[in-house]
Amino acid sequence: MRDKIKLVSSAGTGFYYTTDKNKRNMPGKMEIKKFDPKVRQHVLFKEAKIK
């Protein structure tokens, strides 16, 4: 089952992406480097729950 998640910037800007992931294939927390336009750099984004 695919669940919706939020990827929050580790730069502390409050910027986030929303995506989904398959919990059966990726049981752990997702971490991925993406572009944060507020700091204009690629930073690490960590998974958080959508409230």
Curated annotation (Swiss-Prot):
Signal peptide segment: none
Molecular function in Gene Ontology: structural constituent of ribosome
InterPro entries referenced in this protein's UniProt entry, alphabetically: Ribosomal_bL33, Ribosomal_bL33_CS, Ribosomal_bL33_sf, Ribosomal_zn-bd
Gene Ontology biological process terms in this record: translation
Keyword match Ribosomal protein: yes
GO cellular component term of the entry, any: cytosolic large ribosomal subunit
Keyword line: Ribonucleoprotein, Ribosomal protein
NCBIfam families in the cross-refs: PRK00595.1, rpmG_bact
Family as reported in the entry's similarity comment: Belongs to the bacterial ribosomal protein bL33 family.
Protein name, per record: Large ribosomal subunit protein bL33
Lineage of the species this protein comes from: Bacteria, Pseudomonadati, Pseudomonadota, Gammaproteobacteria, Alteromonadales
